[in-house]
């Protein structure tokens, strides 16, 4: 395919136009008085949202250089969202301000490499000042306030704070769509996985269609079980002990499954057979998690354990196991707390070292099942469009709340950046074009507060100057128009969100400033309509 090439100012300005198209669409959503953006979908109803990353993802520009600029800024929004769950609009606004100021200086003759170095040093200093300002999140109310601001709804904030309080910061909070209006929180104690009983004959509670086994043994097998001969010695020992048995294996089929069902129906002993969750290595890892949680062992040929030789010592135990047709919950496993802590530490290390988002998500789920618990927030709404938008807002607010617990909070509303900058630039010493790079950051960090003020119908520059003169933590409450102590008023942002937004914006701005040439695909000309006529009815003269 033929390429088009642009150099120097033409290349940079083309990219900047793309950035501006995207940023101008996104920044109208910033702050408590930000507006919504309607996104047309090829299929189904349009989406209405005020989430920066959702808007950015939908924007596809036609002009090649503009498209490249927009794609780079999408990366800022996506990366900030992945890390902190919020701050995508702030990151986009910061990137726009940094690029605008930077390109002005490059056009005036500044050295782009020195500018980038100055920007990086200034961002490092502002980040350090932000972390110094951070206040640890200690109360449920503070978490509720942070999540409530992210979701734009205090009720959602309170529900997320309740969920985090129950499952802990390692716990998993999932968001599901509900048929009922409103919000509902469902908590799961113990480990839950998405596999149910292999036969409805195992059900003990007919009304709820559940198999509930109290104080039961748990047999964990890595392979399939089809022959009853392998299982009989162990079954006899379990029956003598007078306990019920849960078997979790790759599969249980044929005469082995039939024997368990017949014994259950005769009342000889209670049991339930469940397929192990996951596939391949992930299944092995989850079986090992269950073994540590319940104090048992995984019966596997690879470690020299066979089913026919297994003893009661190889079985795990739990106070209660609830199995439905779709899922299994193990409550209060009898595992050794030290071994459990070791396993949790191991999974945490794997999360740190993983490069794949998918693997990280799955490891996080395993960690939650072992260390915390699972909370499900069920969200309902009157229309499908509203439901999708609400679900997305709640998911972002959950990540936002976890970020607040992780690194602490700072004053919200764009105030923390300005006040951290004031502290950072007092001691920062730069020379030449690096100093100009530092000044670019100094100007750009005002942009989020100015945009929040503009969206609230106020004069951005006036508000920024006023906030600069206020005590630390005091700023504009854009919802009311008052200047007050924002942390006391519950207007805060996780420092991780603010920090990530600034760092990611600066990273992309550096790429813009140091770009000297662009090579892009030449747009294809639209082909003429079929039939070669006048484009109406194929030239048929109608």
UniProtKB/Swiss-Prot annotation:
One of its GO terms (biological process) is protein refolding. One of its GO terms (cellular component) is cytoplasm. Keywords: ATP-binding, Chaperone, Cytoplasm, Isomerase, Nucleotide-binding. InterPro entries: Chaperonin_Cpn60_CS (IPR018370), Cpn60/GroEL (IPR001844), Cpn60/GroEL/TCP-1 (IPR002423), GroEL-like_apical_dom_sf (IPR027409), GROEL-like_equatorial_sf (IPR027413), TCP-1-like_intermed_sf (IPR027410). ATP binds at residues 29-32, 86-90, 413, 477-479, 493. GO terms for molecular function: ATP binding; ATP-dependent protein folding chaperone; isomerase activity; unfolded protein binding. It catalyses: ATP + H2O + a folded polypeptide = ADP + phosphate + an unfolded polypeptide. It is found in: Cytoplasm. CDD domains: GroEL (cd03344). It holds the Pfam family Cpn60_TCP1. Its EC number is 5.6.1.7. It comes from the Bacteria. The keyword Disulfide bond does not apply. The keyword Chaperone applies. Transmembrane segments: none annotated. Belongs to the chaperonin (HSP60) family. Forms a cylinder of 14 subunits composed of two heptameric rings stacked back-to-back. Interacts with the co-chaperonin GroES. Together with its co-chaperonin GroES, plays an essential role in assisting protein folding. The GroEL-GroES system forms a nano-cage that allows encapsulation of the non-native substrate proteins and provides a physical environment optimized to promote and accelerate protein folding. This is Chaperonin GroEL. It comes from Beutenbergia cavernae (strain ATCC BAA-8 / DSM 12333 / CCUG 43141 / JCM 11478 / NBRC 16432 / NCIMB 13614 / HKI 0122).
């Amino acid at each position: 395919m033929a390429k088009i090439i642009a150099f120097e100012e033409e290349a940079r300005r083309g990219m900047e136009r793309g950035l501006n198209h995207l940023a101008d669409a996104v920044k109208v959503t910033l702050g408590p008085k930000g507006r919504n953006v309607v996104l047309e979908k090829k299929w189904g109803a349009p989406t209405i949202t005020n989430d920066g990353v959702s808007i950015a993802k939908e924007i596809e520009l036609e002009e090649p250089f503009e498209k490249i600029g927009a794609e780079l800024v999408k990366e800022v929004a996506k990366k900030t969202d992945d890390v902190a769950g919020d701050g995508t609009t702030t990151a986009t606004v910061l990137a726009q301000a940094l690029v605008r100021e930077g390109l002005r200086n490059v056009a005036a003759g500044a050295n782009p490499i020195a500018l980038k170095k100055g920007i990086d040093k200034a961002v490092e200093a502002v980040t350090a000042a932000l972390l110094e300002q951070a206040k640890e999140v200690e109360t449920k109310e503070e978490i509720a306030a942070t999540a409530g601001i992210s979701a734009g709804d205090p009720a959602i904030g309170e529900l997320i704070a309740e969920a985090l309080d129950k499952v802990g910061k390692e716990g998993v909070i999932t968001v599901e769509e509900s048929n009922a209006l409103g919000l509902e929180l469902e908590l799961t104690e113990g480990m839950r996985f998405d596999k149910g009983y292999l036969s409805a004959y195992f059900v003990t509670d007919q009304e709820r269609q559940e198999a509930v086994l109290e104080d039961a043994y748990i047999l964990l097998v890595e392979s399939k079980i089809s022959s009853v001969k392998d299982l009989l010695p162990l079954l006899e020992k379990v029956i003598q002990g007078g306990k019920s048995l849960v078997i979790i294996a790759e599969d249980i089929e044929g005469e082995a499954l039939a024997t368990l069902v017949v014994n259950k129906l005769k009342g000889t002993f209670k049991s339930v057979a469940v397929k192990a969750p996951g596939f391949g290595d992930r299944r092995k890892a989850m079986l090992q998690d269950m073994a540590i949680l319940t104090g048992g062992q995984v019966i596997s040929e690879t470690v020299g354990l066979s089913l026919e030789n297994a003893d009661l010592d190889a079985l795990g135990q739990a106070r209660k196991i609830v199995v439905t047709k779709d899922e299994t919950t193990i409550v209060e496993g009898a595992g050794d707390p030290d071994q459990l802590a070791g396993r949790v530490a191991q999974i945490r290390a794997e999360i740190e070292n993983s490069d794949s988002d998918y693997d990280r998500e799955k490891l996080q789920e395993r960690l939650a099942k072992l260390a915390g618990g699972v909370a499900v927030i069920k969200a309902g709404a009157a229309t499908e469009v509203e439901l999708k938008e609400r679900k997305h807002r709640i998911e972002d607010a959950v990540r936002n709340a976890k970020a607040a617990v992780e690194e602490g909070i700072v004053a919200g509303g764009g105030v923390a950046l300005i006040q951290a900058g004031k502290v950072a630039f007092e001691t920062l010493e730069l020379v030449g074009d690096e100093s100009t790079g530092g000044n670019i950051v100094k100007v750009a960090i005002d942009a989020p507060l100015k945009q929040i003020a503009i969206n609230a119908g106020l004069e951005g520059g006036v508000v920024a100057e006023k906030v600069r003169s206020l005590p630390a933590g005091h700023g504009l409450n854009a919802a009311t128009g008052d200047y007050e102590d924002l942390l006391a008023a519950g207007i805060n942002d996780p420092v991780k969100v603010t920090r990530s937004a600034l760092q990611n914006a600066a990273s992309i701005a550096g790429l813009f400033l140091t770009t000297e040439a662009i090579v892009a695909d030449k747009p294809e000309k639209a082909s003429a309509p079929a039939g070669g006529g006048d484009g109406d009815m194929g030239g048929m003269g109608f």
